[in-house]
C-alpha cells in the first residue's frame, strides 16, 4: 500500500483556535468521548458526511475504548489521523475530526467531523478551520469533506 502521508511529513499534533483545540484522540479520552457521541447520535447522523454512516451505533464504553485505541494506532502508524475536539477552557470533549485515505477515489484523503449536539453552533466553524488547515498544513492535493451551508 502507498503511504498515506510522506515519511518526511511532520504530522500536526495540535490545532488551537479560540473556539476549540484539536489533539490526537487516544484512550485517555474514552469517558468524555463516549459521553459526547452517545448524547448526540441523532445530531451526528444529521451532520454532513454522516447521513449514511453506520456509526455511531450502540457500543459499550469498553468497545469505545478499543475503537479509540485503533484510532491511536492508526495515528502512530500514519495510516489515518483522528483528533479529539476539546473546549479550550474546560478541556471537555466536544467532537472529533477524522482524516483517512479514500481508496479508489480521485481524492487524496477524506475528512469527517462532528460536534456534540450541545455545541452544534461550532460545526460550521470547525469545518471551515479544518478545511483551511488541510489545505495549508497537510500534503494533500484534494480532500473530500462534506461542505456546510
Predicted features along the sequence, with ranges:
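GNAT-family acyltransferases
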Residues: 1-119, 129, 133-149
Amino acid at each position: 500500500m502507498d503511504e498515506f502521508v510522506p515519511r518526511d511529513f511532520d504530522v500536526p499534533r495540535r490545532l488551537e483556535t479560540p473556539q476549540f483545540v484539536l489533539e490526537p484522540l487516544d484512550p485517555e479520552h474514552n469517558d468524555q468521548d463516549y459521553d459526547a457521541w452517545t448524547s448526540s447520535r441523532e445530531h451526528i447522523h444529521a451532520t454532513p458526511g454522516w447521513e449514511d454512516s453506520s456509526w455511531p451505533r450502540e457500543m459499550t464504553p469498553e468497545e469505545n475504548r478499543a475503537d479509540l485505541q485503533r484510532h491511536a494506532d492508526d495515528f502512530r502508524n500514519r495510516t489515518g489521523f483522528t483528533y479529539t475536539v476539546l473546549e479550550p477552557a474546560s478541556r471537555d470533549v466536544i467532537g472529533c475530526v477524522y482524516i483517512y485515505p479514500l481508496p479508489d477515489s480521485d481524492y487524496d484523503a477524506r475528512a469527517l467531523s462532528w460536534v456534540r449536539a450541545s455545541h452544534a453552533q461550532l460545526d460550521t466553524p470547525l469545518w471551515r478551520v479544518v478545511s483551511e488547515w488541510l489545505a495549508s498544513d497537510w500534503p494533500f492535493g484534494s480532500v473530500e469533506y462534506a461542505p456546510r451551508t
